[in-house]
Amino acid sequence: MNVEVWFHGTLEECATGKRIVEMADGASLGELIDWLSKEYGAELKREIERAEENYIMLNGNYCKLTSERYKPLQDGDIVAFIPILTGG
């Protein structure tokens, strides 16, 4: 199956802005993150897993990595990783 992955903000420094990833049918959100870590490095995984500081969107809906890591993905899903902006 193919999953469309978008990286926004500072995560674009670790990976490309947009990419189609081919995964095994039924692969989970966590497996996608593990694959991305192997492709782009551990730095990206650390950034993504800072769940309290980042948004993960699946088809436009917010996902909590702590509770939805094993959620199976579907062909054509769109997963976006969006860091929350901070500053003052």
Can you say where each PLM-predicted feature lies in the sequence?
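Ubiquitin-like/PB1-type beta-grasp interaction modules and other compact soluble beta-rich domains
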Residues: 1-87
